[in-house]
Amino acid sequence: VAQLDTREKLAILADAAKYDASCASSGTAKRNSKDGKGLGSTEGMGICHSYAPDGRCISLLKILLTNSCIFDCHYCINRRSSNVRRARFTVEEVVRLTLAFYKRNYIEGLFLSSGIIASPDYTMEQLVRVARDLRQVHDFRGYIHLKTIPDADPALVEAAGLYADRLSINVELPTDAGLVALAPEKNALRIRGAMTGLKTAIDDNKDARKHYRSAPKFAPAGQSTQMIVGADAATDSAIVATSASLYDRFGLRRVYYSAFSPIPDASAVLPLKSPPLIREHRLYQADWLLRFYGFSVPEVQAATDDGALPLDIDPKTAWALKHRDSFPVDINTAPRERLLRVPGLGVKSVNALVRARRQRRLGLADLARVTRGIDKLRPFVVAADWRPDDRLDLRPKTARPVQGELF
């Protein structure tokens, strides 16, 4: 690796980290240094453009320890055979950068990942050292997310959990077949084994803390994972099924989806262009239907067309249009579970409606007060002053999405 100064390394390794989507700090324990002790906070409002599910804006220094790697995964810009400029931080440099960025109020924490150098154990040791030094030497109380390495010694992963708020292990691709084709040096069984070990450690720690107040916290924000979308032939139906299985088996806080981006000197086995970015967005919406709206995997899959989620409408609307017999729903009498199926109604809106209807019968004006707009809702609801016509041309009424840039 060429001799570079810290600024040059930061430019390379921050850019290399942009392909990792797993960087939200929701769910961690609240800590701050308002009492004059320690340094950092997980509570402040930073300058980040990422938002946690509870609505907090979070800012993280997101970097790689190094973009050198002994693996040669076809889809990865940092693969062994890639002709990219390489850089590597020392442990001390990452610690100094994190503290310097925090003191300037640029960040609330650190997201740290790495290519594999020398061996999985050696690389994992370096990541753990960063987190340990921040916590123990500098009393850093901000958020830390470490991307762990499946092939590393489980003892190193357990050590990481003592210092990091969240740990994550990437499943990489939605299917085992995709992993074999595009990352033959990685092993799906080892990845799932590492995720199982991490779940066990998290569960054991929760149990210990119920009985012993002095038990140290272990990855209090849990574990997450990420999969690349569009690099292989996996359908949205298959991706949804995989995600549901991951949530169920490993108690994940989040599954992140990252749209495949074409890379220089790409292998012939990769697609020539990236999937529409809106596809990634539709998968996140489907993910939320599973986690917060009571949809089953078959129900979400029923919203697809030949395994693909529609790009022009959201998955809940797609499901509703295929189940016209379930609508309209009376907002004054329907159970909460049915209200959650109405396109345009979110969890907070439904909860507000359920509370309000205990006091009076609700009309469209009440509905408008708890939603962004009622035009989308009108065909699917009955209110005290509204009953929709039985229209068949609902799909054209939905707004078409605008394709954004990947970066």
Residues of each region from the PLM?
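Flexible, acidic/Gly-rich N-terminal and inter-domain linker regions that tether
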Residues: 1-68, 380-382, 386-407
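Conserved AdoMet/S-adenosylmethionine-binding subsite of the radical SAM
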Residues: 95, 100, 118-300
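Long, highly charged, low-complexity intrinsically disordered interaction regions
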Residues: 268-341, 376-407
